[in-house]
Amino acid sequence: MGPQARTLHLLFLLLHALPKPVMLVGNSDFHLAGDYLLGGLFTLHANVKSVSHLSYLQVPKCNEYNMKVLGYNLMQAMRFAVEEINNCSSLLPGVLLGYEMVDVCYLSNNIQPGLYFLSQIDDFLPILKDYSQYRPQVVAVIGPDNSESAITVSNILSYFLVPQVTYSAITDKLRDKRRFPAMLRTVPSATHHIEAMVQLMVHFQWNWIVVLVSDDDYGRENSHLLSQRLTNTGDICIAFQEVLPVPEPNQAVRPEEQDQLDNILDKLRRTSARVVVIFSPELSLHNFFREVLRWNFTGFVWIASESWAIDPVLHNLTELRHTGTFLGVTIQRVSIPGFSQFRVRHDKPEYPMPNETSLRTTCNQDCDACMNITESFNNVLMLSGERVVYSVYSAVYAVAHTLHRLLHCNQVRCTKQIVYPWQLLREIWHVNFTLLGNQLFFDEQGDMPMLLDIIQWQWGLSQNPFQSIASYSPTETRLTYISNVSWYTPNNTVPISMCSKSCQPGQMKKPIGLHPCCFECVDCPPGTYLNRSVDEFNCLSCPGSMWSYKNNIACFKRRLAFLEWHEVPTIVVTILAALGFISTLAILLIFWRHFQTPMVRSAGGPMCFLMLVPLLLAFGMVPVYVGPPTVFSCFCRQAFFTVCFSVCLSCITVRSFQIVCVFKMARRLPSAYGFWMRYHGPYVFVAFITAVKVALVAGNMLATTINPIGRTDPDDPNIIILSCHPNYRNGLLFNTSMDLLLSVLGFSFAYVGKELPTNYNEAKFITLSMTFSFTSSISLCTFMSVHDGVLVTIMDLLVTVLNFLAIGLGYFGPKCYMILFYPERNTSAYFNSMIQGYTMRKS
């Protein structure tokens, strides 16, 4: 025997063990004869603690528990819908709907009504291999109102494919059609209720909440869905979550329950959270809110789940207005014409009893006090609008429209025939009709896409006790705000419930503890920014070409800094370079014109042109220092200028050495001097120095790169300094060191030859040039070690131009002066006389 067969066998045993139905004459609140019967399961009396009475095979007596006004209101809605359909000529014409309704005591009485509905008129449920031709006494069941009961009943009805349309059970478990193939509902699932709550809290910027749940499946499942939803977003944090004690029916609060309530309220008093979300049946909240009043809580926001959001009994505790603002999620408000009068109508409808139907009663089909108690709450129920009532009303109409299709009804009559539950179930999935302006149908999960309302409790005499303030659409998953909220706070201000206040723009969140909603705000430092859509807890660094100030939410492009033409230093240096170029060109022409004269020969002859040409080229290449650096300009700075300068220095140095050799070494070391001159020692020296310099420069460039880069100005991060690669500075320092060595050598040789004939005594001119070169190079090295940025470029350019000017004017200037203004001294006779005078002084 399989598990399903064993379950059915157990159900049959239970059916025969339970009390037998009793024959009843006439109609009542719980019975109405008809051609097709609907079963109705409602909570008229509530026992929130499910006690298993099956252990001693007795059905609980529901009227021993507290009456639930809303439950009777919903039962009246089913009666009203059936009576309205029976009086309608366009829907099921000529067909009478009947009903059998049972009080399920919330949780205590679920199995017996399910078996009762499945049995036949003679209280018989046969064991068959095929139930496709089996006719239980009802074709569909409306209810019950809570998820636990709905699941219990569905586990029974699903074996027989009896359609079950619940009007208030929101658990997501019912969406599993493999487990609950016959379950449908006219209310959105718990996921949508939770989403509406979360969007409400996000709208009012409440990110620090307390969650209170009942100790049952309803509380646990909904709190789990809420926690899961909040974990996915991280926008809202739960300060703490507690379980509310479930009271025994008709019993005083036990000491352990009182201690549990006191502990919850003490934590609630000490927390900074001011928003409390409660998932619990309303009967579990009476003791809790009485304690809330006793503790004098004020300024809280209480968010109600659908199970107690529109409960008139809790609302009747008018002192609750002093504890804060009550908000709740419930089904949309749809006014049902005529229902408010029907709810408290005492007369019973009279219809002819079909011949094949014999009425009977079963347990928990009585509620003597229901009408009187409901009358006392009629004003609240009428003003609140028919919310869950419409869910019952639409469920009955969904079954009626399905029967209308199955019976092939036209405008005047229907074809009465046997309707099996599985036929009704198959057809009800395709039903689509308009009821009181709403288009109703079931989606693939069996849910009817009804709107949800966010309501606020009001206590004014003329006010709607459950005023709608917002609407939520399950299809769009969006909350639409339709009115303002009357906050029970000073100056009607929105209550604040935040672990930490929102950070200002440009401030990141530094978590405190385990909750992401608890943090301190830290300013994003310069060079970083905060993009909240990407990461609220870390400041992001700006790209290299961009910058930001403190507390910025975006980066901006930095200003590029380089040597520009319109700047004063550039203009001054350019003028000096132009003068140098012109003067060098003039010297070149003068020396070319007087190439055969003793003055030009004593200055070095052909070697003079070896100096003047690099000088001329160097002055002409000065513009490469101006403008954004490029690979070519960096190459010129690092290679061209330093090679030209080294050629000039090496020529001056070797020229000083050669003059000393002529007058000092020729007599003492004639063979060495002869070797020096025979193998063109001066040119070899210049070529060697040039080759060494070229090798150093090439090695430096190959080791790194000469590409220009942008670097942050240390004095102003908003500026990017465009310059050559930092290696350029290292190479410049190294090359300058070599030039300093040549300057020292040239100065030394010039000093040794200070006693030579006047025409050959170039000590003071070379000393001037070398001293200037030495001083400027030292200054440049010192400046580069201290400063950075465009100033280094300006200083480098200025030193380069001045060094070339010092060589050009310091070395060649006096000679041009003598050639142009003292031509009598530029003769061989004059030079010979000076040499003879020097020889006579030394002899």
From Swiss-Prot:
**What taxonomic ancestry is recorded?**
Eukaryota, Metazoa, Chordata, Craniata, Vertebrata
Which species is listed as the source?
Mus musculus
Q: Which residues form the signal peptide?
A: 1-19
The record lists glycosylation at: N87, N296, N316, N355, N372, N432, N484, N491, N531
Does the keyword Repressor belong to this entry? no
Record localization: Cell membrane
Q: Which gene encodes it?
A: Tas1r2
Which Pfam family, just one, is annotated for this protein? NCD3G
Please describe the organ and tissue distribution of this protein's expression: Expressed mainly in circumvallate and foliate taste papillae.
Report the outcome of E350G: In strain: DBA/2J
Q: Which residues lie on this side of the membrane: Cytoplasmic?
A: 592-606, 664-682, 753-764, 811-843
**Membrane topology type:** Multi-pass membrane protein
Q: What quaternary arrangement does the UniProt entry report?
A: Forms heterodimers with TAS1R3.
Q: Report what the protein is called.
A: Taste receptor type 1 member 2
Topology Extracellular: residue spans: 20-570, 628-642, 704-731, 786-789
Q: Which UniProt keywords apply?
A: Cell membrane, G-protein coupled receptor, Glycoprotein, Membrane, Receptor, Sensory transduction, Signal, Taste, Transducer, Transmembrane, Transmembrane helix
Q: Which GO terms describe its molecular function?
A: G protein-coupled receptor activity; sweet taste receptor activity
Which cellular components does GO assign to this protein?
plasma membrane; receptor complex; sweet taste receptor complex
A single BP term in Gene Ontology: sensory perception of sweet taste
